[in-house]
């Protein structure tokens, strides 16, 4: 499904929170949306592998990587896993790598930056926790919509039709 965050903001102005414009699109989908699962991890993506092995239809993985751009939390292998398991998108408050491969995949990926250095894979982090970045507090179960213009958040799903 295609989302227009500008239009959604016009219609649902009182119901959405707008994330500060920190992110760029690195995935093959220009827009995506779904119910979020939150993750907090710093320069370690082991937990992301576990979560992205689950069916992701209708879901977006939202990762608070502490804003670190020293190590990439998502690479082509991890993004391929997410695509195979039908995740709608990934929002990474951190970095990604292998961006030429990422843009070929049918998944939305928003992140702060790209860097060639990979993350550790120890599995250190927590999921389903409250995270805060970009001026917005995120909870698992909230609904996120993203496109090349921005990212918005709603407690409830927005009627897109």
Curated annotation (Swiss-Prot):
<dbReference type="GO" id="GO:0019899">
    <property type="term" value="F:enzyme binding"/>
</dbReference>
<dbReference type="InterPro" id="IPR036704">
    <property type="entry name" value="RraA/RraA-like_sf"/>
</dbReference>
<comment type="subunit">
    <text>Homotrimer. Binds to both RNA-binding sites in the C-terminal region of Rne and to RhlB.</text>
</comment>
<comment type="function">
    <text>Globally modulates RNA abundance by binding to RNase E (Rne) and regulating its endonucleolytic activity. Can modulate Rne action in a substrate-dependent manner by altering the composition of the degradosome. Modulates RNA-binding and helicase activities of the degradosome.</text>
</comment>
<keyword id="KW-0963">Cytoplasm</keyword>
<dbReference type="GO" id="GO:1902369">
    <property type="term" value="P:negative regulation of RNA catabolic process"/>
</dbReference>
<dbReference type="GO" id="GO:0060698">
    <property type="term" value="F:endoribonuclease inhibitor activity"/>
</dbReference>
<dbReference type="GO" id="GO:0005829">
    <property type="term" value="C:cytosol"/>
</dbReference>
<dbReference type="Pfam" id="PF03737">
    <property type="entry name" value="RraA-like"/>
</dbReference>
<dbReference type="InterPro" id="IPR014339">
    <property type="entry name" value="RraA_gpbac"/>
</dbReference>
<protein>
    <recommendedName>
        <fullName>Regulator of ribonuclease activity A</fullName>
    </recommendedName>
</protein>
<dbReference type="InterPro" id="IPR005493">
    <property type="entry name" value="RraA/RraA-like"/>
</dbReference>
<dbReference type="InterPro" id="IPR010203">
    <property type="entry name" value="RraA"/>
</dbReference>
<comment type="similarity">
    <text>Belongs to the RraA family.</text>
</comment>
């Amino acid at each position: 499904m295609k989302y227009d965050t500008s239009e959604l903001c016009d219609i649902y102005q009182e119901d959405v929170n707008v994330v500060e414009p920190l992110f760029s699109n690195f995935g093959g989908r220009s827009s995506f949306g779904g119910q979020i699962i939150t993750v907090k991890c710093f320069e370690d993506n082991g937990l992301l592998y576990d979560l992205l092995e689950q069916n992701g239809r209708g879901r977006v993985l939202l990762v608070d990587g502490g804003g670190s751009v020293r190590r990439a939390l998502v690479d082509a292998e991890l993004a391929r896993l997410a695509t195979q398991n039908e995740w709608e998108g990934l929002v990474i408050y951190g970095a990604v790598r292998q961006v030429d491969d990422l843009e070929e995949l049918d998944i939305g990926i928003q992140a702060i930056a790209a860097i060639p250095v990979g993350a550790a894979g120890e599995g250190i982090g927590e999921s389903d926790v409250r995270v805060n970045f970009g001026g917005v507090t995120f909870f698992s179960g909230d609904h996120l919509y993203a496109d090349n213009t921005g990212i918005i958040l709603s407690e409830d799903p927005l009627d897109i039709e």
